[in-house]
């Protein structure tokens, strides 16, 4: 029975998780959520044992950075 008192601190230490991961999640632009992430967010990491770091599946700026050439948009201006 004495060993139970010695194992309890190790068990609590195991459940605590790594310190600072919630801060790292926020730095990456995410937020912590208990359980799984809901649409339109995806899991980008872990905040703790049962807590996911959720973020957007895509960024709007990444979609806006795609450039299209004007000759692709204008009919009859194909150089080939």
Swiss-Prot record:
GO cellular component terms, A-Z: extracellular space
Pfam families named in the record: Defensin_beta
Highest taxon of source: Eukaryota
GO biological-process terms attached to the record: cell chemotaxis; defense response to bacterium
Positions annotated as propeptide: 21-22
Locations listed in the record: Secreted; Cytoplasmic granule
InterPro entries per UniProt: Defensin_beta-like
Induction cue: Expression in cultured vaginal cells is increased by LPS and S.enteritidis.
The entry's keywords: Antibiotic, Antimicrobial, Defensin, Disulfide bond, Secreted, Signal
Disulfides per UniProt: 25-53, 32-47, 37-54
GO MF terms, alphabetically ordered: CCR6 chemokine receptor binding; chemoattractant activity
Presence of the UniProt keyword Membrane in the record: no
Keyword Signal: yes
Signal peptide as annotated in the record: 1-20
TM segment ranges: none
Tissues and organs where the protein is expressed, per its UniProt entry: Strongly expressed in the tongue, bone marrow, bursa of Fabricius and trachea. Also expressed in skin, esophagus and air sacs. Weak expression in the large intestine, kidney and ovary. Expressed in the vagina and ovarian stroma, but not in the ovarian follicle.
Record family assignment: Belongs to the beta-defensin family.
Functional description taken from the UniProt entry: Has bactericidal activity.
Name of the featured protein: Gallinacin-3
Organism: Gallus gallus
């Amino acid at each position: 029975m004495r060993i139970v008192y010695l194992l309890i601190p190790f068990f609590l230490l195991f459940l605590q998780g790594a310190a600072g991961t919630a801060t790292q999640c926020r730095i990456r632009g995410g937020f912590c959520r208990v359980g799984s992430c809901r649409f339109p967010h995806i899991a980008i990491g872990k905040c703790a044992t049962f807590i996911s770091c959720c973020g957007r599946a895509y960024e709007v700026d990444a979609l806006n950075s795609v450039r299209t050439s004007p000759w692709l948009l204008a009919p009859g201006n194909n150089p080939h």
